[in-house]
């Protein structure tokens, strides 16, 4: 990604029309979108997940993500390639944060470029569901009343 300023991207890989990043310090949603190949596309569908500031009526200070760092980029890339094949989309760019993510900050970003919107929306929804089910990530929610590990792989 030319001209892209990032705060320490830990792992980055591109395979065909799939671009994956694992970001430690920040996630630049718009710069990630620039990794898409828009050839022949009339649609870009985007999902951005952010740390909520309140959960179950209690203030959330931050999330802390732990990852199997050697495996995470490959899992994300495999999901992107599956989405391209299964839904007929042209290009996928996805990124996930690790470490500390404060309330309001992006955790995950998924961009899907496709000829038409229907397959883009379907692929994007499938990607976030599969990422949550398959990615080797664990999440600790730190709230004003304590901390709790949330469901994750493993």
Regions found by a protein language model. Give the residues of each.
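N-terminal, polar/charged subdomain of small-to-medium soluble alpha/beta proteins
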Residues: 2-4, 8-107, 113-154
């Amino acid at each position: 990604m030319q001209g892209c300023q990032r705060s320490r991207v830990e792992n980055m890989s591109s395979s065909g029309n799939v671009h994956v990043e694992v970001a430690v310090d920040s996630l630049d949603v718009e710069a990630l979108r620039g990794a898409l190949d828009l050839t022949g596309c009339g649609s870009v569908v985007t999902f951005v997940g952010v740390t909520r500031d309140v959960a179950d009526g209690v203030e959330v200070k931050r999330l802390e993500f732990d990852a199997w760092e050697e495996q995470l980029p490959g899992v994300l890339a495999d999901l992107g390639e599956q989405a391209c094949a299964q839904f007929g989309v042209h290009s996928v760019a996805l990124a996930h944060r690790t470490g500390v993510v404060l309330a309001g900050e992006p955790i995950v970003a998924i961009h899907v470029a496709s000829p038409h919107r229907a397959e883009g929306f379907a692929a994007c929804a499938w990607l976030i569901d599969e990422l949550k089910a398959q990615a080797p990530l664990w999440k600790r929610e730190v709230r004003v009343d304590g901390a709790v590990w949330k469901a994750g792989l493993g």
